[in-house]
Each structure stands twice: as structure tokens, then as C-alpha cells.
Amino acid sequence: MELYREYPAWLIFLRRTYAVAAGVLALPFMLFWKDRARFYSYLHRVWSKTSDKPVWMDQAEKATGDFY
């Protein structure tokens, strides 16, 4: 039984297109904003999200093979 639903490919493409467009459009403003890391961290989460599962949980599950 799956607890989390995988997003369809078109939705992942749409999310990643949004992340790139928002990052490029915001770049001139972000150059002078002191808290730009939070904004680009948010865009990274939008880019990385491919299911209902939280991004931190998905990345933690993928990284377990690196240590064992």
C-alpha cells in the first residue's frame, strides 16, 4: 500500500518550469535581498518534489545507501 502518490510527468515538468522561470525573473531582485537563500531553498523544494511525500523524507530515504 502506497502512502504517497507520485505526480504525473506533466505536473513535474510544470513545477520545474515554474521554478526556473521564478528563479530567472527574481534574479535581479535577489541580488540585493539579504535573505535570498530562503527563496532559492523554496525553489529547490519545488524542483525536487515529485510526489506527495515530503522532500526531506524522500531525500533521507535515498541517502541511506550512502552510509550503509
From Swiss-Prot:
InterPro entries the UniProt entry points to: YbfA (IPR019663)
One biological process term from GO is: response to radiation
Q: State the Pfam families in the record.
A: DUF2517
Q: Where does the record locate the signal sequence feature?
A: 1-21
For this UniProt record, the keywords arranged alphabetically read as follows:
Signal
Instruction: Output this protein's name.
Output: Uncharacterized protein YbfA
Q: Which organism is it from?
A: Escherichia coli (strain K12)
Q: What is the lineage of its organism?
A: Bacteria, Pseudomonadati, Pseudomonadota, Gammaproteobacteria, Enterobacterales
**Gene name, Swiss-Prot/TrEMBL:** ybfA
